[in-house]
Regions:
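C-terminal substrate-binding/active-site "lid" region of AdoMet-derived donor-dependent transferases
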Residues: 162-219
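Glycine-rich SAM-binding Motif I of class I
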Residues: 90-94
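S-adenosyl-L-methionine
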Residues: 1-78, 114-148
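Conserved SAM-binding motif I beta-strand of class I
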Residues: 103-108
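Residues in the short beta-alpha loop(s) of Rossmann-like NAD(P)-binding domains
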Residues: 110, 120, 188-190
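Active-site segment flanking the S-adenosylmethionine/decSAM binding pocket
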Residues: 136-176, 180
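Conserved class I S-adenosyl-L-methionine
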Residues: 79-88
Length: 227
């Protein structure tokens, strides 16, 4: 990790941005996909009218995504469904597919991003792929019905607090109705205070990458220690 004073030196920030761009482009070239490029909300062609509650699209960094996935405190991936809320062009879905999850799902309200993600899933080429049940779902996140399996939920600050609050409320209710292990990885946690309102999901000590928090269900038989 590069200290902030170093990042602010002349030319360093530009060099870091260039290096990041190269890494994204290499990932796309190597795996025959297209995950790069931001997309503003007005361009998204959303399935809902509440576009003001969404954030613009910017993909997770492949290196950070792989680190997060490698440090998940779960013993048997095959029991869990991985869900990226606000999954964009599907980069985290492709990274998650490198692990033997029961299924990998992306929830995306933009028709444009969903279409790209669907193409990426179909074209993805990676000898490390372990999960082949991968799908992008084009739906308002508030209307998404969480699977009954244990879950790993990934949030890269995808929504404004009003929308995120409702999604978390739905998730908490799902855990209450069907107690099971649920992990939530929240990157760039600007609205972390919303988790304080949840009854069945609480923060753990885990911080797999800088600027991340991990939450876990406190269903019977599960500890919030993160182990």
């Amino acid at each position: 990790m590069i200290p902030d004073p170093i990042k602010r030196l002349p030319g360093v920030h530009s060099a870091l941005m260039t290096a990041t761009w190269v890494q994204f482009r290499y990932f796309d070239w190597r795996h025959r996909v297209k995950t790069t490029g931001d997309l503003l909300v007005p361009e998204m062609d959303a399935v809902t009218q509440d576009t003001a509650l969404a954030g613009f699209y910017h993909p997770s960094h492949p290196r950070s995504g792989r680190r997060i996935l490698s440090l998940l405190p779960i013993a048997d991936h095959s029991r869990y469904t991985f869900i990226d809320m606000g999954s964009g062009k599907g980069l985290m879905l492709l990274l998650a597919a490198e692990h033997p999850f029961k299924a990998v799902r992306g929830v995306e309200f933009s028709r444009k991003l969903h279409a790209v993600a669907t193409d990426n899933i179909a074209n993805y080429t990676n000898p490390r792929q372990r999960c082949f049940d991968v799908e992008s779902v084009n739906v308002d996140a508030r209307d998404y019905e969480f699977p009954s399996t244990p879950l790993v939920i990934y949030l890269f600050n995808p929504f404004r607090h009003e929308l995120l609050g409702q999604v978390l409320k739905n998730l908490d209710a799902s855990v209450a109705a069907n107690p099971r292990d649920v992990l939530v990885v929240y990157l760039n946690p600007l609205d972390a205070y919303l988790f304080e309102r949840l009854e069945h999901i609480k923060e753990t000590p885990l911080h797999p990458v800088e600027g991340s928090r991990v939450y876990r269900s406190i269903a019977p038989g599960n500890r919030v220690s993160g182990r």
